[in-house]
Structures are given as structure tokens and as C-alpha cells.
């Protein structure tokens, strides 16, 4: 059990309090759902969900953690690749 406690403490230091992160992420997703006018493919929706998750971590935690920004670019790239004919 100490391992999960350590992991949660490390994540908390990097990303902030989880309940606040959850509120931020869910509010971002609500905005997308409220204004979405077209049905998205599953990968597009999932990428947006994950991007909201990563933005929540950036806003709530360490905005200088490059990996969060890298992940956002990666999710967007996966969709762009599929749209351009390369399914990963």
C-alpha cells in the first residue's frame, strides 16, 4: 500500500489536488459538449477528452512540466495522422 501512497503523493505534487483537477477537466469537457455541433469519431472525442485532462493538469499543477504539453501534441497528432491516412 505504501507504493500507491507514494505515487499519489508524487502526482499530487506535480498535478495538484485531484478533486480540483477533476472539476477543471470536467468543466472543459462540458464546454466542448455544449458547443459541439458535429458527431466526432471515437478517436477525435477521446483525443479531446485526454487534451482536457492534460489541460486540467497544467492549470491545476505544474505548467512548466514539458511532458504534459508533449502529450497534448501527441493526442492531436494521432487524430491528424488518421485523417491523413496513417492509422496508429
Language-model features: locations:
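Intrinsically disordered, low-complexity regulatory regions
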Residues: 1-88
Amino acid at each position: 500500500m505504501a507504493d500507491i501512497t507514494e505515487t499519489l503523493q508524487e502526482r499530487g505534487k506535480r498535478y495538484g489536488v485531484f478533486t480540483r483537477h477533476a472539476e477543471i477537466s470536467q468543466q472543459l469537457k462540458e464546454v466542448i459538449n455544449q458547443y459541439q455541433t458535429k458527431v466526432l469519431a471515437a478517436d477525435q472525442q477521446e483525443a479531446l477528452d485526454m487534451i482536457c485532462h492534460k489541460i486540467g493538469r497544467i492549470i491545476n499543477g505544474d505548467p512548466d512540466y514539458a511532458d504534459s504539453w508533449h502529450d497534448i501534441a501527441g493526442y492531436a497528432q494521432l487524430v491528424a495522422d488518421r485523417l491523413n491516412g496513417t492509422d496508429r
